[in-house]
Amino acid sequence: MIFNSFLLGNLLSLCMKIINSVVVVGLYYGFLTTFSIGPSYLFLLRARVMEEGTEKEVSATTGFITGQLMMFISIYYAPLHLALGRPHTITVLVLPYLLFHFFWNNHKHFFDYGSTTRNSMRNLSIQCVFLNNLIFQLFNHFILPSPTLARLVNIYMFRCNNKMLFVTSSFVGWLIGHILFMKWVGLVLFWIRQNRSIRSNKYLVSELRNSMARIRIFSILLFITCVYYLGRIPSPIVTKKLKETSKTEEREESEEETDVEIETTSETKGTKQEQEGAAEKEVKDDKDLFWFEKPLVTLLFDYKRWNRPLRYIKNERFENAVRNEMSQYFFYTCISDGKQRISFTYPPSLSTFFEMIQKKLFLCTTEKISSEELYNHWAYTNEQKRNNLSKEFINRIETLDEGSLDLDILEKKTRLCNDENEQKCLPKIYDPFLNGPHRGTIQNLYSHSSMNNLLITSIKDSIKTLWINKYQGILDTDCREFEKEFAEEPMPNLNLKSPSSQGKFYSENQSKNFFDAATTYPNDQTIIDIEESLEINEIKKTVPRWLYKLTDDLEEEEIENDEESKPDHGIRSRKAKRVVIFTDNEKNQNTPTSTTETTSTAETTSTTETTSTTKNTSTTKNTSTTETTSTTENENTSNQDQSDEVALTRYSQQPDFRRDLIKGSMRAQRRKTVTWELFQATVRSPLFLDRVDKTFFFSFDISGTLKYFFRNWMGKDAEFKISNSEEEDTKEKEKKREEKRQENERIRISETWDTIIFAQAIRGYMLVTQSILRKYIVLPSLIIAKNIGRMLLFQFPEWHEDLKAWNKEMHVKCTYNGVQLSEKEFPKNWLTDGIQIKILFPFCLKPWHRSKVQFDHRDPMKKKGKPENFCFLTVWGMEAELPFGSPRKRPSFFEPIWKEIEKNIIKMKKKCFIALRILKERTKWFIRVSKEKTRWVIKIFLFIKRIMKELAKAKVSPIPLFGLREIDESSINTNQKYYINIKSNQIIHESPIRIRSLDWINYSLTAKKIKDVVDRTSTIRNQIEKITKDKKKLFLTPDRNINPNKIGCDDKGLESLKKIWQKLKRRSNRLIRKCYYFLKFFIERIYTDILFCIINSLRIKVKLFLEAKNKLFYKNSSNDETNKKGIDETNPNTIHFISTIKKSLSNINNSNNNSQIFCDLDSLSQAYVFYKLSQTQVFNKYHLRSVLQYRGTLLFLKDRIKDSFGTQGIFHSESGHKKLRNFRMNEWKNWLRGRYHYQYDFSQTRWSRLVPQKWRNRIHQRCMVQTKNSTYSDLYEKDQLIHYEKQNNYAVELNQKDKFKNYKYDKYDRLSHKYIHYEDKKDSYIYRSPLQVNEAKEFLYNYNTYNYSTYNPKLFFMSGDISLNNYLREDSDTEKNLDRKYFDWKIFNFCLRTKIDIEYWTNMDIGANVNKKTKTQTNYYQIIDKKDLFSIAIHKQINPAKQTKTSFDWMAMNEEILNCPISNLELWFFPEFVSFYNAYKIQPWTIPINLLLLNFNGNENVSEKQNINGKEKKDLPILSKSNQKKSLELKNKEEKKKPAQENIGSDTQKQGNPGSDPSTQQKDIKKNVKEDYDGRSDIQKRKKKKQSTGNIAAELDLFLKRYFLFQLRWDNPLNKKIINNVKVYCLLLRLKNPKEIAIASIQRDEMSLDVMPISKTLTLAKLINKGMLIIEPARLSIKRDGQFLLYQTITISRVHKNKHQTNQRYQEKRNVDKNGLEKSIARHEKLVGNRDKNPLLVLENILSSQRRRELRIRICLNSGNVNVVDRNPVFCNGNNASNCDQFLNEERHLDIDTNKFLKFKLLLWPNYRLEDLACINRYWFDTNNGSRFSMSRIRMYPQLRIS
């Protein structure tokens, strides 16, 4: 079995080797390149389709393969690659070939001279086919500029060793793929030839062949391809060239030269502040030096590549450029780990500079060093430097141990000096050798005089050495020019041109002397001053550079009237036009101008407009109409002429891909950005998809859905709304779609007019002509014609009405976007920018005018549908509703006339129809009556005739007739006679049956039948009448009488019954209707009462039970004082129902949050880890470990210093015999796990401030139950109480004054070294159990006040693995806890237990006061505003016994804050949580570093002297809407009042707040506004804008100053309203009597009065309350101040307390002198001079920070002897030798060189995320400039194998 597995393993390894071999991979990549199909395939196909013979097919195939082979060879052969890879080379080759190709195919007789034979011509054509395929194969890669499959070959080229084999195999693979491809093409062609349908259509085949023969398709294709590529890369002729300056300048003349900028050598450090300003000046002496570098060659093969695809990235604060080159791939060789490797992201500027230097040094070139020698030299140098550093460090320690306090022990910073004797140095602020905390802050950076004074400063502390690098001979420093540059253009804070870089290029003939000048002396590392040793001619040569500051079109328009001459703009901005909509000229002459009110209204308009609109530069297409207002105020004091212009900037609506491109640069492809959300504020790259917590597919918010569902369910009158039918929805969608389509059509038309040359001028003239024609010719002629026609028709003329309507029509000139100006004033540059003509009250010719009385009786619904009373004139004289809209249908003149005629005709027809109908009815009736009469007469006549016959026959008397009647009466049923009232004259008609003669046979039968029928009908009729009468009697209906001839006796009773019935019916209906609501209200009352009673009774019982149970814990406690000390003063009788549920809810969230703590490692940003590791100030102590862990008396290390290391957790004395730790990944992960709770490891002073024991015991009991929050559940209550007792006893005995001092490095040094050195969890500080007693070493946390021998209490450490949310006191959150970092549910546990209401606490955080009766109210966040680096003294005034401090998770940059339920604070049954949510929106605590929340203003002396009146009444704005309707009264007890209200020196009165009246704060406001404006951009200065001292301006400035992390926005409807208001106001400002237009505009809803308030006193707080303005936190990390980046390393000295605090409450100020802001405390003062406050010395501070890191890294990069186990001869000889034995015995466990080196490389270049590299670069290698990111390059390292 083992044998089988062995065989299997061998087979697998063999297969892997075969697969990874160069040949197989080359075949694979070559086969892949088959699929990158280009135009060259078309020629190959054409040769096969045309069937011109096998010769052409063979030649085409040969050319195709030859071209591809040349491309593969060009990968390996550099000259061929240069020739084919350069874009302009291909362009130059293409153009002649295109010309030749065109003539060859269209005019073959040019080449046919008649004497040539056909055979030779055919041969020439075969050669042309070969040439076509060859050349187009070479063109293939530039037609598709970046085909991925072709680039794969280039990528793999740098990974394989045998490059030629790879090229050959990839070419073979490509050949195989193309053979298969051509075989496939042959099969397809064969199928086409065999297909009958294609073969039968001979016409199609012949046409195809003719077109292919004429080859027009390929000529067109070739032409389009060349033009396309010329569009992508600007041709060298058209490109904007650099400015040429021809004359050679001396050094004296250079002071007058302002255009020529100086090349920075700090390019080698990565500063990309190159400038484009000046081109190379040819020096006359060196004209013939490089004669071959002529314009043609540099035009086509310019390796400097001035036209590179670069983007200009602005710094928002200082408007200076950082040229970002991180996205470029640039291959160059660099030395990495002692070996030369190819870096694919090498800085192009460095390679350019290196090649320039190589040209200068061609005389001194030496042989190339082999790679082994290079590596050995690197290893040797590294070893030497490491040993030197170690020796130097140990010597310094020994000197310090001898007791010497000489300042030479400490390593000092190297300063940049100009002259060694005069000691003139750069100021510390500008010294490039000084980084981080050595720099001070600058307040007044921008005045030229102070800048010049700063430059020549004598500093005595600096070292008098001149440190010059190898290139300093070429690049000498010229201070005068440097000074001149400062005077001309102030130096910014951020992207500082380092003073060392200001040099001049000397001429090339001085290159020999350069090497003599650059000889170094290794002992003192100085160089002899060049000016003393050599006489150098002062002929110099400037290097072309990019413009340091490029402006765009908008900035150029803003500064066009400036006095200083500025260069042309270098950036193409968005296509925009500046439209001036109002100009107010105030001159000395009495010119008629607008009133002051009008001007101020215009200014208010422009200010609001500026705030409203945002310029979106990241999207490629901006479909919304964006208009930005800029107010330009130009003052000319000499002329005393002031002109104010209010202008709108109109942007083009089409996608503008030229936007933000540098002129003359290559068009860079935009990065691939996607939007995967429905609403997304910013575009994000898919590279960082893993950083987003929710993707589109998993963004189901279940809680949000439930929330809305239950809200509707539990509402009072909540009903589920039934949506409209689907038809209405579809109609609405169709309507919106149609409106959108029309809007897009209008935009397209306007853009078309805007792009065509001279179209605007033509259109403008046509519009003006149409306006004049309409107003003065067409309409008057129509009026005259109409009235003459009325007079001809004998009607009154309507001259007055028509002329009145004609006069009312106004033709207002508008800008291109429709902003109204006036009737007579044309817009500025209207011929180029465009014009619109708006017709107000357009005249409509009517045939007659109705009286106005008729309008009043109209339906009001019809008035609403009335069209708007304006239109826009089109080019053809039509009317349109909107600019560029479709022409609307004008009301016709004859239409009402035709309607009136139709009405009259209809009326006439109606009358005629009525008459005809009556006549017709009368005739019908007459005919019918006449027929009936005739019939009756005939019947009578026949009857009489029949009787006469009967009488004549029978001669009987007429009595039988009457007898018959009697018989009939008697035959009626007697029973029915009772009910029938027969009138006396009633006649019963017999049926008209002929009476037969008596002697007929059938007479008896017939008579019997007739009698039966009569009886049956009469019986039925009587029964029906009886039934109806019975019904009437039963129902007693009083509506009818039973007998119509007489009134019933009880008729009145029936009427009253009827009324009673109706009333009952109404009441019952009303009761039924109200029954639902009554029942609902009743049930709700019952439900709430019962629920309240049940819950409160349960709550009281549970509380009593808990109190009874907690009494058991009190008996165990003996410390009565601490029991009385801080017990919550909660009244047990008061019952808080809401708070109970809220508390339980927050507990649930608390447990849910903490349950994920131990598994979620991804939320820790590795960049932050490296940031913290870089901040550690203690070096790598592998060499000193034996000394520090020696139990005996140390030789040179005092116990005091050893105690300091013990305090910092660098070592434990117990771990002396443990093995030497190493870098291991499990240690890394353990550290990551422990980092979540590291903030909970507190010192004794922190434990002393724990909450009273009643609360402690209760929380501890809960902690025992909730095992989710605790790692160790085996804690004993008794030990815990002992622990607390000792803690509190110790805290009482501490001195109050020194109790809260902070030691700087105690926490994170320990953490960093724990990570780097430790592996054993047992004795680690992080993994210690909470009640473990460290008996071996007693840590003394207060070094000043205690005698170490007498007082040695046993102290305890608390584990970080236990959630201290169970222990820490949170009561201060309800008061003034100003350092809370983010909003957490844990706060609810404690703030809801006290008497302070939630609303008050929320308003306190926001800065809003709801109740005016509240006496003590401070703007709390104004305190935070002033709590910057220099406000540490303020904290010392607070009484620390009452100000408790909580500890929250300060890693707010990670995902853990996303897991907190911030977004779901608005729970459905607790609307009070909405206030928390709104508070979070206004002031979220998500910023990780305290600096981000602060105003970085240095001078705090004023604020310390000020006191806030604690009883001052203030009405602050209510910023959250949910708080408006609620008010509360707070009982301010004396114990709740803190000293901070009187002592905290936050100048709240100076700062103000958005809602307070700013008029009382004017003096301080002016000062603050001035300070704030100092840091603004140069463009704002160039405007020379007045600082507004008005209330609104001051308030806005203060508001923006406070909420700089937030943005104000409003909804789109408000934006549209404001745009409309601007348009209307622009018109009103120019009218003499604007009242009529204003009223009409308000009636038409054009102008909304609520948006444009008439009063100026409407504050921002009111706007926010009205819902017009919405405060949102800024999602982007906007830099508040340039000083934040420049002095970023100051944060090491004063990081937030939650991060670095272990044993003291407050921090003392460090590294910064508050009085002299431009001077920083020296290192020796910081370490030695302040010994009272800081008795212990961190040894590593002897070295500078850069040398410190160098020592650590060199120790880890220690390569060489493998068997050496970190041995240092200093420690391994003499008395110290025994200390090293314990390390040498464990040699087998450590491969110290290889393993540690590998782990260290994993540490430096981890394979986690790319953006971490930038952070490593910034923080580890001590660079704090963002532009130096290009130095941190990703390199492809070879696979490292551990031997």
Swiss-Prot record:
Please note every region of biased composition (Polar residues).
Answer: 1543-1562
What transmembrane ranges does the database entry give?
Answer: 18-38, 64-84, 87-107, 124-144, 172-192, 217-237
| Example of a GO cellular component annotation carried by this entry | chloroplast inner membrane
Q: Where is the composition biased (Acidic residues)?
A: 251-264
Membrane topology recorded in Swiss-Prot or TrEMBL = Multi-pass membrane protein
Known function: Involved in protein precursor import into chloroplasts. May be part of an intermediate translocation complex acting as a protein-conducting channel at the inner envelope.
First-listed, main subcellular location of the protein, grouped into a coarse class: plastid
Protein name according to UniProt:
Protein TIC 214
Organism, per UniProt?
Answer: Nandina domestica
UniProt KW keywords: Chloroplast, Membrane, Plastid, Plastid inner membrane, Protein transport, Transmembrane, Transmembrane helix, Transport
Q: Where in the cell is it found?
A: Plastid, Chloroplast inner membrane
Q: How the protein assembles, per its UniProt entry?
A: Part of the Tic complex.
Q: Where is the composition biased (Basic and acidic residues)?
A: 269-281, 730-744, 1527-1540, 1563-1580
- Annotated Low complexity bias: 590-639
Question: What segment(s) does the record annotate as region Disordered?
Answer: 244-281, 557-576, 582-647, 724-744, 1527-1586
Q: Name one GO biological process term.
A: protein transport
So what family is this one in? Belongs to the TIC214 family.
